[in-house]
Amino acid sequence: MKKTCKTLLLSLLVLVFACAAAHCEETASVYDDISMTELLPELVARLDEPLLTEDGYYDFGGALVAAYESGRLKGKILAFDDIAAVAAPSQADFTQAHSLRQGASIESVEELMGGPGREIAMLRLSDGENAGSRRVLAWANEAGDAMEALFELDDGQWVLFAAVRIPAAAH
């Protein structure tokens, strides 16, 4: 299961960087306005007709949505050009973030990072042992380094699975 979650996080990172959004604030607003409890037809009626990407995602102006055949949402992803433009500010450096281990609570991660992260992805998986909800949160420090962490909802607690460094030169 750990390998699947890390693979999922890395896949999300590739997808997010591959999908560029021109207006970060507008895109973030649309992303925040999408509820995982909505059905795809409800979103289309409320937010306008999305573009369908090659990967089967529905693009609502930079907020990407994946849905099951039933129309139930299985994920949403915030697309951006520069992660530092959308990530929450942090005083932490990667060395500190790297010290986090699997099992860290979201509260301890936020304390280390200096505040809540910016959600850039939410997934709801329904396949066997991998079933559950996952969130990817992002922070960026003054040096321009961006850090992301994947959390899984487990018994009411968010659990850290991975922290990934995105050097300033990459964004």
List each model region and its residues:
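Bacterial N-terminal signal peptides that target proteins for export
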Residues: 1-9
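Bacterial N-terminal signal peptides
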Residues: 10-18
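Sec-dependent signal peptide cleavage junction
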Residues: 19-26
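Second-shell loop/turn segments in exported
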Residues: 28-33, 92-100, 136-138
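A cross-family detector of function-defining hotspots
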Residues: 36-82, 102-171
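Intrinsically disordered, low-complexity Ser/Thr-rich linker and spacer segments
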Residues: 79-95
